[in-house]
Regions:
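Sec-exported extracytoplasmic/periplasmic mature domains
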Residues: 31, 45, 49-53, 111, ...
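Active-site segments of SGNH/GDSL-like serine hydrolases
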Residues: 119-128, 144-179, 202-207
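Active-site cleft segment of glycoside hydrolase catalytic domains centered on the general acid/base Glu
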Residues: 128-143, 168-180, 213-222
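Substrate-gating cap/lid alpha-helix
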Residues: 163-202, 221-225
Length: 252
């Protein structure tokens, strides 16, 4: 299945959003962020504010914290912008958590948050520490099934794995990342449905782990913009939601 830079999940489909869309951000350390980060979630909030406006959307989820690297726990609320509204900080993301961890909890999270759109960035931690590409893809399918059990009309946008710096020196790991992305695309093609569309976002345009991350894995400000842009452009191109991402591709 081609990525949504060129096609939609259901060709030509436009998602009606007469009522406020309820977004849930799901991810690992790249999504939760660490103390002092802005996070791509913050960049997406800015985009939603600009394109859907007050009352046109809500951000949901059971967590609001950033990861505190000194405490080795998600205890921080020190976002890069202290004025980031508390309700918009909500998410379901965890440092060291992947598809393996999120598949068992997503149904309860969707039900309790009343989420209807999931923006998901998972897989790197699975492949790095927990499961091979085949099992990781199986867990992604289980995640989608569980989310639909809680909301049969749930909509999902999935980001492919972005190989980190480890892939430059670990050829088997790099191959597993590539294979998982192929399997993820197949899962999207298999599971996409009119009542519950699933999109595979494009790899963020121009994303460079040497300049868009602070350590070869986790996004800095430019990387945050590019991650948010991948999700935003997928929804706009495929569903007519919001508009093209216009966030500044520069440091905050």
């Amino acid at each position: 299945m081609a990525q949504v830079s060129t096609v939609t999940s259901q060709a030509g489909a436009v998602i009606s959003h007469d009522v406020a869309m309820r977004f849930l951000f799901v991810g690992d350390s790249m999504t939760i962020g660490r103390a002092g980060d802005f996070t791509w979630r913050y960049r997406m909030w800015q985009h939603l504010e600009a394109t859907l406006g007050d009352g046109g959307y809500a951000i949901t989820g059971p967590r609001t914290e950033l990861y505190d690297t000194e405490a080795n726990a998600p205890l921080s609320h020190a976002y890069g912008d202290a004025s980031f509204p508390a309700p918009a900080r909500r998410h379901l993301a965890g440092w060291g958590e992947g598809w393996l961890h999120m598949a068992p909890v997503i149904a309860d999270a969707v039900a309790s948050a009343r989420a209807d759109v999931l923006l998901v960035s998972l897989g790197l931690i699975d492949l790095g520490f927990y499961t091979d590409s085949t099992q990781t893809a199986a867990n992604a399918r289980a995640f989608i099934t569980a989310a639909r059990a809680a909301n049969p009309r749930i909509r999902l946008v999935l980001l492919p794995v972005i190989p980190n710096i480890r892939a430059e020196s670990d050829a088997p790991f790099a191959a597993e990342c590539d294979r998982f992305n192929t399997l993820l695309a197949k899962a999207v093609a298999d599971l996409d449905a009119p009542a519950s569309p699933v999109l595979l976002a494009s790899h963020p345009t121009g994303y460079d782990i040497h300049t868009d991350t602070y350590d070869g894995t986790h996004p800095g400000p430019t990387g945050e913009h590019k991650l948010a842009g991948a999700f935003a452009d997928a929804m706009h191109q495929a569903w007519g939601v919001g508009g093209p991402y216009a966030g500044a591709l520069a440091t905050a």
